[in-house]
């Protein structure tokens, strides 16, 4: 059961709350409130009634007959202003195991080159001399004035230098060195152009020339010998082996050098030389 002090305290709280909602109360409402308060003090309460008939006091909802203005529309707004809850759902971050996508740049656009143009630019020739100058050949030296000299060491003269000449290009000087090296050392020589040996092999050419010369000389000697024999036979037949003058004329026709080179004949030879009669041996 509530005591009078508790009832008065509740009433003051109700007054405080409801008066705050109406900042400009009317005089009629204040008079009614005062009359109710005085009647509440005069009548009093019996504590036995509170025990038998308990009542529930609504402090939030005011009575419509006491207040002229509408409070229902303002109380929810006040409650809404005083009690506001913000519900922010937690963010769930899910880390995926997928790799980031690769960034592949598209290929460049194909450019077509037009070869047939109106004014084609003349192409400059590639200098070949520069490449030849950079290469070093065996036995070749470059002179300060731009020409090339070829030299070789002669093994038969204790390695003395043999001058081969001065050439316009390094290739010509290298070929001159190769020819001389092959002539001195043969197949043991180290050459700049070993594949060109067959073109300028001096020994092969000299051997062929000597063989041909000897062959021609042998044919000429055979012809001369046949002619000499025929001449001697004719002279012998005409003279009959007794005319000395015919033999002398035949000797005059021969060359003196050929006569001296002939071999000596024996007296026992069946052929009488130079028209003399054959000697008989007893």
Swiss-Prot record:
Residues 77-98 have a biased composition (Polar residues). Residues 77-100 are annotated as: Disordered. Its main location: nucleus. This is Ethylene-responsive transcription factor 6. The keyword Calcium does not apply. Probably acts as a transcriptional activator. Binds to the GCC-box pathogenesis-related promoter element. May be involved in the regulation of gene expression by stress factors and by components of stress signal transduction pathways. The gene is ERF6. Gene3D superfamilies: AP2/ERF domain. One of its GO terms (cellular component) is nucleus. PANTHER family: DNA-BINDING DOMAIN, ETHYLENE-RESPONSIVE TRANSCRIPTION FACTOR ERF105. It is found in: Nucleus. The keyword Transcription regulation applies. CDD domains: AP2. It comes from Arabidopsis thaliana. It comes from the Eukaryota. It holds the Pfam family AP2. GO terms for molecular function: DNA-binding transcription factor activity; transcription cis-regulatory region binding. SMART domains: AP2. GO terms for biological process: cell division; defense response; ethylene-activated signaling pathway; phloem or xylem histogenesis; response to high light intensity; response to nematode; response to reactive oxygen species.
